[in-house]
Amino acid sequence: MNLEELKKRQGKIRNFSIIAHIDHGKSTLADRILEKTETVSSREMQAQLLDSMDLERERGITIKLNAIELNYTAKDGETYIFHLIDTPGHVDFTYEVSRSLAACEGAILVVDAAQGIEAQTLANVYLALDNDLEIMPIINKIDLPAADPERVRTEIEDVIGLDASEAVLASAKAGIGIEEILEQIVEKVPAPTGDVTAPLKALIFDSVYDAYRGVILQVRVMDGVVKPGDKIQLMSNSKTFDVAEVGIFTPKAVGRDFLATGDVGYIAASIKTVQDTRVGDTVTLATNPAAEPLHGYKQMNPMVFAGLYPIESNKYNDLREALEKLQLNDASLQFEPETSQALGFGFRCGFLGLLHMDVIQERLEREFNIDLIMTAPSVIYKVNLTDGESMDVSNPSEFPDPTKIATIEEPYVKAQIMVPQEFVGAVMELAQRKRGDFVTMDYIDDNRVNVIYQIPLAEIVFDFFDKLKSSTRGYASFDYELSEYRPSKLVKMDILLNGDKVDALSFIVHKDFAYERGKLIVDKLKKIIPRQQFEVPIQAAIGHKIVARTDIKALRKNVLAKCYGGDVSRKRKLLEKQKAGKKRMKSIGSVEVPQEAFLSVLSMDEE
């Protein structure tokens, strides 16, 4: 293609993504757009086509982003090239959303006609506005009996401040309004602005590992052109590779002769190791490099940490490889090796949130076949020592001696909870119980309220989300962002079995709740740990002070069964002998801790 044609083609490209709260019909809308533009033949069509991971289909959520090229012939007779970049809607995957948005010029905002705006919708809209995207509101599910498009229209205008007068009323399920949406994309989404003649700059927004071709980069070309045979250079580490193949996704990978400015596609350059590529890096040509990289994504910092240990210790290396492969297309997963006396060798992993943690654990168990034990999740605490030093600690077993600690600060998040009016009381009670501080609340419409609290992240990490859903019959939606660190009265609680600390069961707790938390745990462990041949005390301790204790009674054989009648001293001798045996056993015996014991520390408030 000559320059003229490339520039003309660039004017026909539209890059957009779809943003929505969970279950507002984002993946279904993507399906309809694929069908309408005949990208996928009806034979290959299946619901939620872009959610290709089993886990995504089962949970009905989108986890990974996906990029597809479609051709659409508009009413003006021209054929346009659409790049649809599908994004997740869940709070833990915000970084996936920000990555998708960095590759786009426009965003379709899908809002459910019955439910209206939810917390996540807002969070994603703000991300889109940060990226200066053209936002097109669409009111979806208008075929539902409870749909009230006019109310939602005013909501979009009042709460977000977007002009919704031209918002398309659609039903992705019934296929209503799809054509209008496509026409609006052509009219409203701007064409890419890059320069074809400039040195190549392409943003890596994802990467996947292929056993045959190495690491395959998914890129959005911002400036210039890339084709097979070029020598590319990664700007973060200056490594160079030879391009073997470039192409696009129509969900399947299809090879192309080149990728030019505005294109979204993949580059295969036989990159062998996972560590060479970072999502958010800039690809340029080694022969004619760009002067400076694109500003990538802000590095996502993990907020939740937990230990992952293989149940079979010989699977340790498999677990490392699996984590490396997951890290390849999940840049926010961090891990480092750690050992525990109770669990052996494993990794300390950092996650963005609980759903992220859950999904990673499931992917490890499914895709890589590794059975795992996971320790209680914790957050990063700032510990200020008496000698003026300060340290960041995410693992309870690394906490310094209590006598050396001056103060401990913990992270607080600003939580936005959107909830129908009748549940406001329940939500406030829950937030108070989780040590939350009330900030403000405002009414979105006659019925829905946005309540804002400052809550310690450590309290949210446990089971806040489940509790919120159950106390509001599932109507609340919830979004949080890290706000600040505050000093708190925190203590580290150790659990002792038979006098020995079990490092994997230690956790950090607020001083005011320490006693009841300790009592709860020892009672719970008593039910779970099987009885031994000797008595096992279970203790909860803060430093050297025991705050709760319970004993697992010993199993004992009736040694007097063979003494029909007989002298009392004979009986006493047998009992003393048994007692001495038990004592000896106790001094050398070790207690097996079953898997459930570690999990019981997680699910604290179920009683």
UniProtKB/Swiss-Prot annotation:
Compartment annotation: Cell membrane
EC top class named in words: hydrolase
EC number, UniProt record: 3.6.5.n1
GO biological process, one term: positive regulation of translation
SUPFAM superfamilies in the cross-refs: EF-G C-terminal domain-like, P-loop containing nucleoside triphosphate hydrolases, Translation proteins
Swiss-Prot/TrEMBL catalytic activity: GTP + H2O = GDP + phosphate + H(+)
Biological role stated in the UniProt entry: Required for accurate and efficient protein synthesis under certain stress conditions. May act as a fidelity factor of the translation reaction, by catalyzing a one-codon backward translocation of tRNAs on improperly translocated ribosomes. Back-translocation proceeds from a post-translocation (POST) complex to a pre-translocation (PRE) complex, thus giving elongation factor G a second chance to translocate the tRNAs correctly. Binds to ribosomes in a GTP-dependent manner.
Protein's recorded name: Elongation factor 4
Species of origin: Streptococcus pneumoniae serotype 2 (strain D39 / NCTC 7466)
This protein's encoding gene: lepA
